Amino acid sequence: MRHCGWLLGLLSLFSLATHASDWQEIKNEAKGQTVWFNAWGGDTAINRYLDWVSGEMKTHYAINLKIVRLADAADAVKRIQTEAAAGRKTGGSVDLLWVNGENFRTLKEANLLQTGWAETLPNWRYVDTQLPVREDFSVPTQGAESPWGGAQLTFIARRDVTPQPPQTPQALLEFAKANPGTVTYPRPPDFTGTAFLEQLLIMLTPDPAALKEAPDDATFARVTAPLWQYLDVLHPYLWREGKDFPPSPARMDALLKAGTLRLSLTFNPAHAQQKIASGDLPASSYSFGFREGMIGNVHFVTIPANANASAAAKVVANFLLSPDAQLRKADPAVWGDPSVLDPQKLPDGQRESLQSRMPQDLPPVLAEPHAGWVNALEQEWLHRYGTH
């Protein structure tokens, strides 16, 4: 047995040495490469953070990180699909992509992503694997994307205006009736607007188990009927009587600050802190959620199969997982995006820093529906309410 243990230990050391050697080869190959990182560019705090990442990659890794700021990640997905259709198997225009679950599913099912690389990154050892880092919208990731940050649908209110917020869908409806014109949500297919529909669906449907699989027509009609009944009652009491909707959460923030709205929505539980720090929301702003829970997920970066700078893209993804990068990202004065690292896996000083930057008193996290529900919900919403 002693010899067995010795042999296993030797094999483990050999494996670690091999892995370190492989990673050094990747870093060597990455030097001088240019990475085109396609990411949503709709938030100045995120843009500033990515500019900092760019500088770090140049200084410490000799990698040229170019940020392509997107209005919608679907634009990059279409480019990847077009390149694949044209037979462009190498030299693709996208090296790294900040992706949501719906777009991940689209690319993965078409075999347009590299797989099996995420858990080989050296900084994976710090990841909190209790988070849903191995599936995305109920789709197994299979190492095809690396976690970057946590997220949870979150309401924002002002304590001087709304000291007691609604904590159930029914309470939200009563709140809207009592305060007509001061409640709304972003127009789907805005990501946060669609997440709001998913949140209501989870809480209103009599068959939440059906949300774990992609719907067929009959299932969709049956499961979503309570959602449309709820919205039909809610909409007349919304901002502009539900005949128009803000295009984005940023517009809702501005309307909340102006006093037009009583509630805003975000998919970042630290968003209110960050916007208070930047002066974009009043100091009385606070976050809250429904008592039973709010949907949450992990957001990821992925590498297309035809990426031109695959090695450098992996080095960037690994840096994004580093304690220094995650701590900076979690700082509300910088971005305020929740970390995907486990504080217990970090050295003492970093552990305490990360714990101090983790949002407190959050409601339970509810799992998102299967990615197959997203487009179906958006199309039905547009059919019912999008032509006003």
Curated annotation (Swiss-Prot):
Q: Which residue ranges run through the membrane?
A: none
Q: Which SUPFAM superfamilies match?
A: Periplasmic binding protein-like II
Q: Which Pfam families match?
A: SBP_bac_8
| GO BP terms in the entry | transmembrane transport
Any one annotated GO CC term: outer membrane-bounded periplasmic space
Report residue spans for region: Disordered: 333-357
- Known PANTHER family for this protein? PROTEIN YNJB
Query: Can you name this protein?
Result: Protein YnjB
Write down the species. Escherichia coli (strain K12)
What is this organism's lineage? Bacteria, Pseudomonadati, Pseudomonadota, Gammaproteobacteria, Enterobacterales
Gene label: ynjB
